[in-house]
UniProtKB/Swiss-Prot annotation:
Its EC number is 3.1.26.3. It comes from Shewanella sediminis (strain HAW-EB3). This is Ribonuclease 3. The gene is rnc. Homodimer. It comes from the Bacteria. Digests double-stranded RNA. Involved in the processing of primary rRNA transcript to yield the immediate precursors to the large and small rRNAs (23S and 16S). Processes some mRNAs, and tRNAs when they are encoded in the rRNA operon. Processes pre-crRNA and tracrRNA of type II CRISPR loci if present in the organism.
Amino acid sequence: MEPIKNMPRLCRTLGYEFNDQSLLEHALTHRSASSKHNERLEFLGDSILSIIISDALFHQFPKATEGDLSRMRATLVCGKMLAEIGFEFKLGDYLNLGPGELKSGGFRRESIIADAVEAIIGAVYIDSGVEKCRCLVLSWYESRLAIIQPVNQKDPKTLLQELLQGFKKPLPVYKVIDIKGEAHAQTFTVECYVEELSKPVIGIASSRRKAEQLAAADALELMKR
């Protein structure tokens, strides 16, 4: 695995200095670049992020229902939001990608950026424990937590379905067109077919659910144009 450049600058951007910098390098390494890739860290970070955001919402909204809390959490931890955070950090400049992913523009792909954010969260947890990880994640989410409310927090698939129903159009159809990797570290490619769009919209992520949500989010953006 090749060293990743400008680590000090990235650490300043993240707001965290790693005790073991190899953890950060590991978190930024895509499966296309090395057998020692970031998918296990991503798995860990996904779970930790969910706990941190769940806890924050639980205390911030003492009167919110379980459904409201779940929808707000889904909004805050979805691939679209994680990619937004990753782009703010300019993570694409630091990713370790294989030649094929570099050529296809993987450093701009939302799913790869989102997965790297989760992997960094997992790396911080291993490096410093849950409390420092919690403080860091909450600093990333401070402005987002400040504006979120327990209303209209619907995931992209639900919003797309409701939009099409409002126009009395057929519901979207999701189809898995490719699954790569071993059972514990798979990448799913999903096509979303919407009658109003000239061609299917594609979502790529580490689970079918995430890939469908990414495809639905992109379909929504296209429908708004």
